Amino acid sequence: MTEDTLLSARGLTLSFGAIPALVEVDVDLWPGEMLAVVGESGSGKTTLLNVLSGRVAPQSGAVWYRDPAGRLHDVHAMPAPVLRSLHRSDWGFVHQDPKQNLRMAVTAGGNVGERLMAQGARHYGDIRNQALEWLRQVEIDADRIDDLPRTFSGGMLQRLQIARTLVTHPRLVFMDEPTGGLDVSVQARLLDLIRTLVARLSIAAVLVTHDIAVARLLAHRIAVMQRGRVVETGLTDQVLDDPQHPYTQLLVSSVLHA
């Protein structure tokens, strides 16, 4: 791990039975950078995201995280309570299905406020004001603060999940197909929102997507996966404009001819 990286992984390997999900995968992420992980279904993208975030343990290899004080931590050697605390503070996770991250029986404001309370906030007025501000930032009308998420559209649910995740200003966010399943017009609005907020807050992010256009719009760097391996990595525009690996060439070509 180099001196200034925020997150590094070396030699990540994991199989599900006889099927290799990850094969000797190396990853580096720098502060404030967005890394897109792309590839077709079954390439290992989401498995890699889950291993990097400590949700799934690899069979070999290690993931290292540098905390705000500059100390290195082996993610998979952390005690479970420490890892849970990290996910409530320095880290965030945005799921493809926002219902995995939201509490559907709790109001929109309560969903945002809970993450603040997990960090020790106790003043109701301050929590509500911050929730109102974050609803505004994700373009949800303040009048909806006391509404339950089940009354929200798919795009609104995803924006509420983003507000809940970013309200604590995490240093690192993991995103698993955040625009998947949304209408094209809703996707465009959400992508613009993600790009704006991540840049303004200087958040580092690992973004899993099957959509090369999403990667090009959002990511500084890209990692292309095929059958559990990272076959090509580099600056996003460089890789997509001049792909070197045959699989990357095929992915780019399929988009151009779609």
Spans of features found by a protein language model:
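The feature captures the beta-strand-to-loop junction immediately N-terminal to the Walker
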Residues: 38-40
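ABC ATPase NBD Q-loop/coupling interface
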Residues: 62-85
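ABC ATPase "signature
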Residues: 233-234
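Conserved ABC ATPase "signature" region
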Residues: 126-143, 252-253
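Conserved ABC ATPase signature
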Residues: 148-152, 156
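Helix-to-loop junction immediately C-terminal to a conserved catalytic motif
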Residues: 53
